Structures are given as structure tokens and as C-alpha cells.
Amino acid sequence: MPIPRKELPNVGEYVIATVKEIFDYGAYVTLDEYNGLEAYLPWSEVASRWVRNIRDVIRENQKIVVKVIRVNRRRKTVDVSLKKVPENEKRRKMLWWKRYLKASKIVELVAEKIGKSIEDAYREVVWKLEDYYGDPLLGLEEAVIRGPDALREAGIPEEWIEPLYNEALRHVKVKMVKIRGLMFLRSYESDGVERIKKILLSAKEILDKVGDNVKGRIYLLGSPRYVIEIIAPDYKEAEKVLKEILTTTEKLAKELKVEFRFERERK
């Protein structure tokens, strides 16, 4: 179980809980993010609609998302609500927790390999990635895409960088998107081939300047058709690069009196 950053949650916080015991008047749950801290879920906070049996809504050992509604810091007691958690928040929190656990396990594995304690793993890596990226796994994904500098930016100590980066490459798979299109270039001038080469070179220079998280290539499909292919972490980034390429090449084509046309690949 991950090490908690603080002893008790704050009122209004959404937390992951495991249903421990169910009674006629409510249930006791343990908070996964707080080292199994016990919290009380009153009957009145189980569901917004009337239910005959609390077990129609929850069951023992079930993972649920609850909202903290009361905290007694002196007695270290916590009350939570299930009915005050919106559906979208349930999905968001569950996904975040799943990703947090995966990132934590990767960092703990690296800690064991380099002789660091579990406490060091969280203090020096997991929490720093969380603070910088909002999600430790997102930090590892950025490292896979952009390289070790993504870890350095978050303030990770240098002794962690190489082993953590290598472990991320083994365990973190980043989904990439690809967009393609056909660029038609035709010139009737005597030096038309050279003019087209200049246009293609201008496009290649743009691809060479984009960050490590974007890959692209331009190749001849059969004169006068050239394929433009952009691979990026998301469509927004891919479209941004494609737009820059098309704006630059179309402008240059007009200057060089080269016929220009672009067609998006149909899916």
C-alpha cells in the first residue's frame, strides 16, 4: 500500500475506500490512500434515494469513492459520504488511483534496485512527480516520450534518473495518435525538381525542430504525390505541427510557382 503524504484527509476530499463492515446503521470503510485509516459511512450518506437494504448499494471488500464530510483531528476520526460523489468524479478518481498505484510500483521497484528505502521512493520521486505533473504516471509517460529531462524538470535526484527512465521504458506504454495526408506538388518549370525539393526541405526542417514527443516523415508515394505522416501523443499536438507544415509549404509553393494541393487521408 502506498505511503500517505499526510495523516488525515481534508473535508471535501474525494478518496478511495474499501468497505470493511456493514451494519444496519451504516458501514465502516478503510481509506486506501491513508494507510487503511478507518472511516465511518452513515446510512444517510449511502444513497440519495431510499433503499430497503444498505447491501443493495455496497458490499464488503468493494472499492468505492467517497467524499470526506467530517474530520476530528484530535480523535483521528473521519466520516464519509457515498451519495455526495458525482459519477464523473468516481470515474476520474478510480482512474487516477489505478495510475498512481502503477507509478508507485515502478518507483518502488527502482528503489529496490538502487538500494533506496520505500520512504525515499515516495519522498524523492513519487510525490515530486505528483506535485509537478498532477499524476506520477503522467510524469513517467512524459519521460518515455521526451526522455530523462522530463524527470529532471520535476526535481528528481540525478541518482534516480537513468534507472527510473529505463524502468519506465519497460513498463509504461504511451498511446500515440497518427494523422496522414497527401501533398500534391507539380511544377512545369525547367528547374521544377529543385523547386519541389526546396518545398520538401522546408517541411522537413519543421519536423526536425519539433520536440521529441512528435515524430513525422514525408515521403514520395508516386509523383506528384507526397505523404505527410505525423505521430504525436494527442491529435491537438499532431494537428498543430501539420498546420505549420502546410502553411509554410503552401506559401513557398506560391513563391516558387509550384502547384500545391493537400488532401486529408480518409479513415
Curated annotation (Swiss-Prot):
Gene Ontology molecular-function annotations: ribosome binding; RNA binding; translation initiation factor activity
Keyword Cell wall biogenesis/degradation among UniProt keywords: no
Domain S1 motif: 12-83
InterPro entries, per database record: NA-bd_OB-fold, S1_domain, S1_IF2_alpha, TIF2_asu_arc, TIF2_asu_C, TIF2_asu_middle_sf, TIF_2_asu
Keyword Cytoplasm: no
Entry-linked Gene3D superfamilies: EIF_2_alpha (3.30.70.1130), Nucleic acid-binding proteins (2.40.50.140), Translation initiation factor 2, subunit 1, domain 2 (1.10.150.190)
Alphabetical UniProt keywords: Initiation factor, Protein biosynthesis, RNA-binding
NCBIfam families, A to Z: PRK03987.1-1, PRK03987.1-4
Assembly mode: Heterotrimer composed of an alpha, a beta and a gamma chain.
Function: eIF-2 functions in the early steps of protein synthesis by forming a ternary complex with GTP and initiator tRNA.
Family assignment from sequence similarity: Belongs to the eIF-2-alpha family.
Name of the molecule in the record: Translation initiation factor 2 subunit alpha
Biological classification of the source: Archaea, Thermoproteota, Thermoprotei, Desulfurococcales, Desulfurococcaceae
